[in-house]
Swiss-Prot record:
SMART domains: DEXDc, HELICc. NCBIfam families: PRK05298.1 (NF003673), uvrb (TIGR00631). SUPFAM superfamilies: C-terminal UvrC-binding domain of UvrB, P-loop containing nucleoside triphosphate hydrolases. PANTHER family: UVRABC SYSTEM PROTEIN B. Belongs to the UvrB family. InterPro entries: Helicase/UvrB_N, Helicase_ATP-bd, Helicase_C-like, P-loop_NTPase, UVR_dom, UVR_dom_sf, UvrB, UvrB_inter. This is UvrABC system protein B. Forms a heterotetramer with UvrA during the search for lesions. Interacts with UvrC in an incision complex. Residues 627-662 form the UVR domain. One of its GO terms (molecular function) is excinuclease ABC activity. Keywords: ATP-binding, Cytoplasm, DNA damage, DNA excision, DNA repair, Excision nuclease, Nucleotide-binding, SOS response. It is found in: Cytoplasm. The gene is uvrB.
Length: 663
């Protein structure tokens, strides 16, 4: 058993909260202390929401889970929080699959697709680091994607199976080795890696699953632990002496031997009942398939203690009743903790939708004899269960969704940007002669070396408009969903560099389109109500022009819809608040100068002057060149992950998939 140690949260920053940040921090902190369950931070683009969240965590002093809606965003937040809290445990918990094809069955073609996955070892290490941190200290911030609501092993079992070693403790070497094997560590004296241990005489070296380069050297003197040291596993350099060390299990799905026996009996009983059911329905093929697959898994469990796809038996392994709520990362937090949901208008619907998608796929597998019905219990949480498990939540969004609005009695607003930048001016113009009018507006921006985003409603309109603009001599490109990640990043970069002056697209709300050079956003068909022209989408689109001090938005429409009116009024309200603040403090709005990164690059061996020259990937390559480029990108991706630059690593990974697919 390990004791949770107490440490205060300490922020490292050159800045103090300013603008309306102090007020927002105070309101949220007071709300949490008063026991409020739901609060929403309505933070406009560029107002420093992350800094506000950090200050709230520091004041409240509770372990905190921050959920983002994708890995890229989680990686970005992880880097930012790590900078703010270098002395505290900031952890990263996302799906460890670089690539994941879940097992599935297509009845119409009688095709079974085996589970195929590539696990990222570094992310697996970070997941172990996150869960073990929660049992070691209370100053923990975990940045997670929605994968935190997926099944994980029993936290009590995980905690109880910790192997605790202490100097002076009576324990012989073979007892330690036995305990390590029980928690799924394997002995490997040659290939020493995470989750293994090696033995040299009276010295046992253990590579914990939660560590990256650090192993633990335990030295014995007879039946007593004589010395414990932290060692660099590569160089053998001793880093520090330890009095005590807790070794957490190498897997989150770890089960004691006596429990495994009970679990196997339960699986056999369920198999017997299910086979009878299938045979009674004359589904003989399905029955044979299920019997064969399950018996193979059971044999593996008896011999090895685990099997491939063991998570499908999690309800039995944790001895829970069928249909009960699975254990997830949320259960690893204690009783008093905090949840923050970033971009909640996107993240909450994602949390809500996870269960149904997963259920539909697994039901087909169960119906056709690929899995036992209990496999349905290896699932993400239902939304109601998520609500039940979370005690206090802070939603963070520039455009809160219906759930947040319904559950929060009063929004905590953060409208003022420390940079003084105002929300853009909005003008509504009639659709008559809109294209000629648009061209003259673009011309004005081009002369000032500024960029333009144009959003349309249909793919055809985007294509036609792009062609028309090209014929009119405008440097324009078209961004649509079929464009690969690689090209997409390249197009945005080229817009910033001035290769293009205009980008035309349908949904320009995806992350990565915050471009300070954009001074004009044009919304065509603004009066056509629908998902892309809802008040939330309009406010988000308008926000794309809020990073430039000359930011303007033109909506072409023949009538004023409720969504337009709301978006215009809200933008004007925020604009006035910022203007008053600027006037009071003598701030002059200034466009943010954001460095243009060359992400579309593969590190290549180049001339002596340039150690890390980066080349743009050529469009046509020989097989040999392609392989060399793939190797280079892979190297760069691993380096980026090591440097905790997950945003870059994710983009490089997507590039890698595309290059491999093209090969």
């Amino acid at each position: 058993m390990t004791m949770v140690e107490h440490y205060p949260f300490k922020i490292h920053s050159d800045f103090e909260p300013q603008g309306d940040q102090p007020q927002a921090i105070k309101e949220i902190v007071d709300g949490i202390k008063a026991g409020k369950r739901h609060q929403t931070l309505l933070g406009a683009t560029g107002t420093g929401k992350t800094f506000t969240m950090s200050n709230v965590i520091k004041e409240v002093g509770k372990p905190t889970l921050i959920i983002a809606h994708n890995k890229t965003l989680a990686g970005q937040l992880y880097s930012e929080f790590k900078e703010f809290f270098p002395e505290n445990r900031v952890e990263y918990f996302v799906s460890y699959y670089d690539y994941y094809q879940p097992e599935a069955y297509v009845p119409s073609t009688d095709t079974f697709i085996e589970k195929d996955a590539s696990i990222n070892d570094e992310i697996d290490q970070l997941r172990h680091s996150a869960t073990s941190a929660l049992f070691e200290r209370d100053d923990v911030i975990i940045i997670a994607s929605v994968s935190c609501i997926y099944g994980l092993g029993n936290p009590e079992e995980y905690k109880d199976l910790v192997v605790s070693v202490r100097v002076g403790m009576e324990m012989d070497r073979s007892e330690l080795l036995r305990k390590l094997v029980d928690v799924q560590y394997t002995r490997n004296d040659i290939d020493f890696q995470r989750g293994t241990f090696r033995v040299r005489g009276d010295v046992v070296e253990i590579f914990p699953a939660s560590k990256e380069e650090l192993c633990i050297r335990v030295e014995f003197f007879g039946d007593e632990i004589d010395r414990i040291r932290e060692v660099n596993y590569l160089t053998g350099e001793v880093l520090k002496e330890r009095e005590h060390f807790a070794i957490f299990p190498a897997s989150h799905f770890v089960t004691r031997e006596e429990k495994l026996k009970v679990a196997i009996e339960r699986i056999e009983k369920e198999l017997e009942e299910r086979l009878k059911e299938l045979r009674d329905e004359n589904k003989l093929l399905e029955a044979q398939r299920l019997e064969q697959r399950t018996n193979y898994d059971l044999e593996m469990m008896r011999e090895m203690g685990f099997c491939s796809g063991i998570e499908n038996y999690s309800v039995h392994l944790t001895l829970r009743p069928l249909g009960s709520t699975p254990y997830t990362l949320l259960d690893y937090f204690g009783d008093d903790w905090l949840v923050m949901i970033d971009e909640s208008h996107v993240t909450l619907p994602q949390v809500r939708g996870m269960y149904n998608g997963d259920r539909a796929r697994k039901q087909v597998l169960v119906d056709h004899g690929f899995r036992l019905p209990s496999a349905l219990d290896n699932r993400p949480l239902k939304f109601e269960e998520f609500e039940e498990k979370t005690k206090q939540l802070v939603y963070v969004s520039a455009t809160p969704g219906p759930y947040e609005i319904e559950h929060t009695d009063k929004m905590v607003e953060q409208i003022i940007r420390p940079t003084g930048l105002l929300d853009p001016k909005i003008e509504v113009r009639p659709t008559e002669n809109q294209i000629d009018d648009l061209l003259s507006e673009i011309q004005t921006r081009v002369e000032r070396n500024e960029r333009v985003l144009v959003t349309t409603l249909t793919k055809k309109m985007s294509e036609d408009l792009t062609t028309y603009m090209k014929e009119a001599g405008i440097k324009v490109n078209y961004l649509h969903s079929e464009i690969k990640t690689l090209e997409r990043i390249e197009i945005i970069r080229d817009l910033r560099m001035g290769t293009y002056d205009v980008i035309v697209g349908i949904n320009l709300l995806r992350e990565g389109i915050d471009i300070p050079e954009v001074s004009l956003v044009v919304i065509l068909d603004a009066d056509k109500e629908g998902f892309l022209r809802s008040n939330r989408s309009l406010i988000q689109t308008i926000g794309r022009a809020a990073r430039n001090d000359k930011g303007e938005v033109i909506m072409y429409a023949d009538k004023m819809t409720d969504s337009m009116k709301y978006a215009i009024d809200e933008t004007q309200r925020r604009r006035e608040i910022q203007m008053k603040h600027n006037e009071k403090h003598g701030i002059t709005p200034k466009t943010i100068n954001k460095k243009i990164h060359d992400l579309i690059s593969a590190t290549v061996e180049n001339d002596e002057n340039n150690d890390k020259a980066q080349t743009v990937i050529p469009k046509k390559m020989t097989k040999k060149e392609r392989q060399k480029t793939i190797d280079n990108i892979e190297k760069e991706m691993k380096q980026a992950a090591k440097d905790l630059d997950f945003e870059k690593a994710t983009e490089l990974r997507d590039m890698l998939f595309e290059l491999k697919a093209e090969g």
